[in-house]
Amino acid sequence: SETPKAAKPVDLMIFATKESGLRGAMETASGFIGENTLMLSVLNGVSSEETIAARFGERNVIYCTAQGMDAVKVGNALTYAHAGMIVLGEKQPGGISPRVQQIADFLNTHGVTAQPVGDMVRRQWGKLMLNVGINQTVMVFEGDYGTVQKPGKPREIMLAAMREVQKLAGLEGYPISEAEFDDWVNLADSLSPAGKPSMRQDGEAHRKSEVELFAGTIIRRAEKFGLDVPVNRWLYDTVKQMEAGY
């Protein structure tokens, strides 16, 4: 109930905004963040932790993904078939640290399913791979999860975009195995066919999407390796054209 001006440091700060709102949220939260405050970002992609670390230092940044949810928000009503879960861990691979376990226990105790892992950044690349495929494809084809769960052009585009991320992740030092690739595709296939990813909902509401966080990130990072990512370039250009028409 404290205002930012009267703030005192908290034990845990969770950032749960859109990418476009992160910097503003950090400024609002700055008074609540002290030298021992742990920070957790549930934003999509692989860059929000870097943004937070640049502002507050990386020592207390816990890496995280939110996955498996199929929520659809219309007005002020939120519906879902799968609530999903939080996966969290340290930046450096290894065991599960006491502070990560403590956060996971706290979340699980308060009704948020959380799983601590020892290979968090690689997990983030897997989630980014899924988002790059499913979010952008469903937006471009103006469909729902069911659109990419059946054979056809949309599914082919989704899988091709994911393959490009798989190649890039390996070059970045976070290889995604074929078995893991299949697991992410199976996760996509398990979502409610009538559900819609956040980018599709942004498109329907004529809001700017997170295409920079997805295809934009892939294109920029691929360039430093000389990796061609034509499917993501096509998705990026198509989404930008759609947004220009709002």
Features from the language model and the residues they span:
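Short, solvent-exposed beta-strand edge segments and adjacent coil->beta transition regions
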Residues: 10, 83-85, 198
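Glycine-rich beta-alpha junction loops
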Residues: 44-46, 65-70, 92, 120-124, ...
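Internal alpha-helical scaffold of NAD(P)-dependent oxidoreductase catalytic cores
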Residues: 31-32, 54-60, 75-179
